[in-house]
């Protein structure tokens, strides 16, 4: 099981798209810049814990649900 720097962004993008949200909407709800979210989703910037927490809540998820999804992605 190897952690990939793009994994966090991949999972966030997947969950955002599943909910039919734009980057603009999600970033606004999470209180972060859209460009920051873009960099996270592209894997060029790693979010800190607080940012992951804000994004999870904006997606109406528990942060642990995002982590669980990352674990699933690692297994595939």
Residue ranges and their predicted role:
Residues 10, 20-21, 47-50:
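Residue-level signal for the short linker/turn that defines the boundary of a DNA-recognition helix
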Residues 44-54, 63:
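Short, basic-rich loop-to-helix N-cap that marks the start of a DNA-contacting helix
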Residues 17, 28, 57:
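Alpha-helical residues within the helix-turn-helix
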Residues 2, 57, 65-76:
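Short, charged recognition helix plus adjacent turn
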Residues 1-18:
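A short, Lys/Arg-rich alpha-helix, primarily the initiator
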Residues 12, 41, 67:
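DNA major-groove recognition helix of helix-turn-helix
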Residues 20-39:
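Short alpha-helical DNA-recognition segment
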